[in-house]
Amino acid sequence: MKSTEQKIYGRNACLSFAKSSPKTVIRAYCTEENRGRLGSLLKFLASQKRAYHIVSSDDLNKICESEHHEGVCLLVERMQPGDETQLLKDLQAVPKIGSNLLLCLDGITNPHNLGAITRTAAHFGIKKIFLCNIPVESQKSLVSGAFHRTAEGGAVHVELYCSAEGKSALEALKKQHGWNVFATSSYGRSQSLHKISFPQKLILVMGSESQGVSDSILQIADSKVCINGTGHVESLNVASATAILLNEYARQKENYRSAVSRPTAIPTRAVRAEGRNRKGS
């Protein structure tokens, strides 16, 4: 496998990728049981004179270096996250009205957490994830086969961006474009999630389970948010915490939409009074 290529495995991940980006598929491997599910992709590969192989599950274990392939593996052109410059450029095109959220993951590199969070983001319609404070040597391995399998196809609906830093980009979005930074924290003056009103242009920062949100980003946060619990455990898994926060964001966003689109009712008494005035005129 070349450095410009990567393997994606897992049925939902492969089917979503094959549907959205068939031209980037170099080669396909699948068991006989999954041949029908990949029918359109296999026909496309054959028309482009690209190879596909029907193999046993044991062979796929070796190809994927994992037993969690669900009978399907694709060799594709490597997906690389965008950088800070691309993030700022893309966010300038975001509509100025309505609710917008940028999900920022601070120092999170575990592929299973990243995949689970990406799946959740896709479910709630979040379009962009910014991975910040990621060491350069770790950036190339973030978008792995394990990441795609855990994302269950969500990765094709979410754009990823990555930086070894992150504070400067968030500051630029705050000062130049009016975004608000909300960071999760269990310490200090954190507000309960259920008492928070999310702004229309929101950067939601999630920290790693071992380190939390970095001090440099906490310093520029407009608000700190916590999820109240029993205290029996120190914290939630970051993927679980993200799901809870995004659900609350989606709830507030839906309420905002309903309030904006709901027609204003004229009180009954006012209508009657208006009618009497017309009769007397």
Where are these predicted regions, by residue range?
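Structured adenosyl-cofactor binding patch, chiefly the S-adenosyl-L-methionine
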Residues: 15, 123, 146-154, 215-267
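Short, acidic/turn-prone active-site loops that include or flank metal/cofactor-
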Residues: 33, 57-59, 134-136, 209-211, ...
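Active-site/ligand-binding-proximal alpha/beta "capping" segment
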Residues: 182-232
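Active-site helix-initiating loop/hinge in glycosyltransferases
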Residues: 10, 106, 113, 235-237
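N-terminal positively charged helical leader segments and presequences
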Residues: 1-93, 259-281
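RNA substrate-binding interface of SAM-dependent RNA methyltransferases
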Residues: 16-19, 23, 30, 91-191
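Short beta->alpha connector loops at strand-helix junctions that form conserved
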Residues: 56, 77, 106, 132-133, ...
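Short, glycine/polar-rich helix-capping loops at beta-to-alpha or helix-loop-helix junctions
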Residues: 37-38, 136-146, 211-217
